[in-house]
Amino acid sequence: MKKLFLTLIVAFATLCGFAQEIVKKDATFEDYLPLFNEAGYNVFSYDISSLKDVSSLATLTVLEYVKGEEVESKYANEALISTLLKISEFDEDAQRRIKEKGSAYDEENDIYRLATKLNISFTPLFNDSIQQLSFELTGTESIGYFSSWMILRDNRVDKSHRRLNYYLRPFKLEKFEKGKFIPLLIYGSSWWDADCECYRFCGDSELSPDMTSELLKDSPHYFIIGVKFE
């Protein structure tokens, strides 16, 4: 009986050892995302498929502000891209080829190409004073692309301080209005807080589209990234 009891103890200990084993796994893309974000790579996606009946053009815009006042940017800050291309806009021969190949997005509803998603991406350049911003409209394939540079400013109150960071915050998405500019993101500089003797970029986690956020009053330099559909 004693021998059987000892055997059971050894077997149980062996099973526990296996249960507590550390198993190596391959890292997934989700595991890499925090590293990309920390390095300055960010992508924001928006579903625009429901706008197909009310919009055929998108104006992609970057607005720059210094101390709350809009200023003229050095680089191109606006692009007009078609979000909807109809089969009927082609000549008769082209329409026939499209239908023969079955290459239309929705032949029944006269849609050849349709943008269903808007991607906004941020890519750091090998320069701490420039940030690249890209817009891409996609459907079953890329529909349109626009890229520009945002020139960052040195907003340190003391040049012995480290270089200031810029931060991203989203705007709240409210009811769609055709022809109205929709702010989607802010990319803004932190500011010096004399009370805590530190730089801050705090406030609303999502900004109101009516531009009343205190953060817009405090940040000395920021960009508003948005779109208008017509």
Regions flagged by a language model, labelled:
Residues 52-161:
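Structured domain cores in non-transmembrane regions
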Residues 36-43, 53-55, 218:
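Short, surface-exposed loop/turn motifs at beta-strand boundaries within globular domains
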Residues 44, 60, 223-225:
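Hydrophobic residues positioned within well-ordered beta-strands of beta-sheet architectures
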Residues 7, 63, 226:
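Residues in well-ordered beta-strands of folded domains
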Residues 18-40:
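Sec-dependent signal peptide cleavage junction
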Residues 1-24:
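Bacterial Sec-dependent N-terminal signal peptides
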Residues 119-229:
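Mature extracytoplasmic/lumenal regions of exported proteins
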Residues 45-49:
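Short edge beta-strand/loop segments characteristic of extracellular beta-sandwich folds
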